[in-house]
Amino acid sequence: MVCGGFACSKNCLCALNLLYTLVSLLLIGIAAWGIGFGLISSLRVVGVVIAVGIFLFLIALVGLIGAVKHHQVLLFFYMIILLLVFIVQFSVSCACLALNQEQQAQLLEVGWNNTASARDDIQRNLNCCGFRSFNPNDTCLASCVKSSHPCSPCAPIIGRYAGEVLRFVGGIGLFFSFTEILGVWLTYRYRNQKDPRANPSAFL
């Protein structure tokens, strides 16, 4: 049977949703690993990562059940949700790739000022204090505070990695965006195909 047939569409859709399931479990595992090893103490960051992982897992589960059972309603809702996720993810990925250095610096400073626990993690892991300058009256968990050498501000250190991280995130986001639009197309095609094992008189 050629790959345009019912069985091939079903297998491709199942494989795609198994990939989404693995990615969702990986996200949840990374968040738990970061908390367990003390790399991340921000519950907000961990909560967002876990929420994204659970959301992706539920989408994959709906798609997998719909594909296995050829369930018209589940496949319809799966297709709509996947299309909405594609639009959001594609927009965010393009924004990550389009940010210039000045916009990156502004975004980093806003994030720095609004996430106290993540700020402590950054200062401890990168061994720096303050964003552009360090106020001795502020609390800093970096080891450089205990040394005789002055602590470096975190902005230049973060800035060196920000561009690479944004390009990486944008690239990964674009890759998954195209897998999502592929999933929408496969779902639409598979949903309108007739199951050869079904009753010929049944309405699809």
UniProtKB/Swiss-Prot annotation:
The entry's keywords: Glycoprotein, Membrane, Phosphoprotein, Transmembrane, Transmembrane helix
Transmembrane regions listed in the UniProt entry: 20-40, 45-65, 73-93, 168-188
Membrane topology per record: Multi-pass membrane protein
Entries under InterPro entries matching the protein: Tetraspanin/Peripherin (IPR018499), Tetraspanin_animals (IPR000301)
GO CC annotation, single: membrane
Topological domain spans for side Extracellular: 41-44, 94-167
Residue numbers of Phosphoserine PTMs: 143
Family: Belongs to the tetraspanin (TM4SF) family.
Protein name as annotated: Tetraspanin-13
Native organism: Bos taurus (Bovine)
Gene, per the UniProt record: TSPAN13
